[in-house]
């Protein structure tokens, strides 16, 4: 409308602009009225081209009283129009058509005159305080108790009650209003007991029945289904050293071992490597002080993770791979037995167990000459559908980078400590962080994924299948895994297992979180990092680190001794609360540890992964190798290239630290490029020279197989023993490939190829 009026006014005078009008209709924040400025003098164009003007013939102007009268009428008309127009604009809400016509925009207000300050940026101290406040008002024990009710117990993987709990977790995620909730399903093979009972029998030398020792209630998944007969030999915990210290050979014999110290799968693998024909596992009273001597228990014997019948690839229903079998499956029968059954067997054995074993007085070493043991295992394979449940809080800056927080959901028995606590922590953390985002102004830069895994009891099957399904891309997106399984098993100690990349973050967290019972900060020992234990095969964090190259951490509040009821029917809420009366406080502390991990990893501009920690790991390896310099020299080899690779890695970390120091922290593009280099450090310690299918745990520090640095050292040690077991060809390959893996990690950390200063 205004443009038309101005156009008409201009055309009246032959198109020459004789005046202009400027409006400012925006209401000021301080409440001043809008105003109008009008000029009726002819403004000359100051920047016009004089030569152009000279060539333009201006039309003749009208003259006399008619012309002046016309001007006066138009001026008074415009003044009246403006007064009415502005009066209308004052009567409407901000951001109306008036403002848009005027070309200005007023601040958005909910009520006239009300002042709204801009949202304050939340810093570390703010977020830490908000997390603590939410933790104080959270009832963890109520949720743990709920998950231990009959509708969810027992919840063996693939069962209806496992699915019931999966749907409950999924619904809870939706109620928490996470950014997105989804599930994935896999069809996997597990092993279950057959209708024909497993048995342990004492027989005479002719194989005739003396008496039945036990039909065990528990079993060991992935055992070979077979019947074997032989003498029984005790091998303590079944570690490699335990077998080395035995005076009695175990070839052709059944081995009996105590539970604890290492996984069932490792015990079985050690026994099988020495040609044992079967393994029995029991819980002694010294290490597991359980009153009920008849208590049975469960475990698995797969020396690996995931579905052992789809090794290295995911168990999706639409993939049709040829029949395959993990090399980690045992070829001998394995069975758990009760303590009462073990004592019956000891009654038919001779020789006291060594005093340094520190076990029960009833322990004996080997069956008498007239007796043998017959072991029958009849387990069968069963294909089941499992569900993994996910929820995500999307990041505000880098949503494609995420930290994963996960917990096992299934359990062979009630699973209060084994999976109930972890699932409760997962649900409460998801709820708290969603509230912090929706209500408290928390804006994580990176995404947070909450994952509920199934079939964890069978070797982290659900978690591993997910990793296998996204092997090619996950390391570019997921930069940390936080495991909540078995986070509360006691109160005396705080223990942690993790990638070295997370050591600095763990230390800062321990300096901020207090022990739930003593009230002292968890950080009490400056040398704590040297006492960190390696992630074990039965920990869901292990495949993240060793298979996918994703930094991972697992922690627990626990005792010096093992929690006795894991994998048994006594893993109930009742037993848990009796052993840990301050369960809610301890669960709160565990949630605070995990919560602070999440905040630091998703909020800070610089990724909290300390890549320089691997310098110490490499230096330690080189020092160990230097002890064998003479042997290496005798083979005509040199360590010079290994030294060079380690030096390149050290220089790459120093250069990256300098780059971070020089970077403008507000430049998101630059910071993302630097963070991307840090994210790939762990991944580049996966050996590129072995197949994920044949050797899934490719990490040269934390994996398993001949490609690892510990395996290289073990092979080299055999040369000094001079027993013909040393394999020089293997060692040459190990040294070369280890060197190039370290060099590759250094090159990747350096950045672009033109930034690599390499005279290797």
Curated annotation (Swiss-Prot):
Changing residue 644 to A: No significant effect on binding to transferrin nor HFE. Induction: Regulated by cellular iron levels through binding of the iron regulatory proteins, IRP1 and IRP2, to iron-responsive elements in the 3'-UTR. Up-regulated upon mitogenic stimulation. The chain crosses the membrane at residues 68-88. Residues 1-67 are cytoplasmic. Changing residue 648 to A: 16% binding to transferrin. InterPro entries: PA_dom_sf (IPR046450), PA_domain (IPR003137), Peptidase_M28 (IPR007484), Peptidase_M28B (IPR039373), TFR-like_dimer_dom (IPR007365), TFR-like_dimer_dom_sf (IPR036757), TfR1/2_PA (IPR037324). One of its GO terms (molecular function) is virus receptor activity. Residues 569-760 are annotated as: Ligand-binding. The modification Phosphotyrosine is found at residue 20. Residues 1-67 are annotated as: Mediates interaction with SH3BP4. A lipid is attached at residues 62, 67 (S-palmitoyl cysteine). GO terms for cellular component: basolateral plasma membrane; blood microparticle; cell surface; clathrin-coated endocytic vesicle membrane; clathrin-coated pit; cytoplasmic vesicle; early endosome; endosome. Its main location: membrane. Glycans are attached at residues 104, 251, 317, 727. SUPFAM superfamilies: PA domain, Transferrin receptor-like dimerisation domain, Zn-dependent exopeptidases. The modification Phosphoserine is found at residues 10, 19, 24. A motif (Stop-transfer sequence) lies at residues 58-61. It is linked to Immunodeficiency 46: An autosomal recessive primary immunodeficiency disorder characterized by early-onset chronic diarrhea, recurrent infections, hypo- or agammaglobulinemia, normal lymphocyte counts, intermittent neutropenia, and intermittent thrombocytopenia. Homodimer; disulfide-linked. Binds one transferrin or HFE molecule per subunit. Binds the HLA class II histocompatibility antigen, DR1. Interacts with SH3BP3. Interacts with STEAP3; facilitates TFRC endocytosis in erythroid precursor cells. Interacts with GRM2. (Microbial infection) Interacts with Guanarito, Junin and Machupo arenavirus glycoprotein complex. Cellular uptake of iron occurs via receptor-mediated endocytosis of ligand-occupied transferrin receptor into specialized endosomes. Endosomal acidification leads to iron release. The apotransferrin-receptor complex is then recycled to the cell surface with a return to neutral pH and the concomitant loss of affinity of apotransferrin for its receptor. Transferrin receptor is necessary for development of erythrocytes and the nervous system. A second ligand, the hereditary hemochromatosis protein HFE, competes for binding with transferrin for an overlapping C-terminal binding site. (Microbial infection) Acts as a receptor for new-world arenaviruses: Guanarito, Junin and Machupo virus. Belongs to the peptidase M28 family. M28B subfamily. Serum transferrin receptor (sTfR) is used as a means of detecting erythropoietin (EPO) misuse by athletes and as a diagnostic test for anemia resulting from a number of conditions including rheumatoid arthritis, pregnancy, irritable bowel syndrome and in HIV patients. This is Transferrin receptor protein 1. It comes from Homo sapiens (Human). The gene is TFRC.
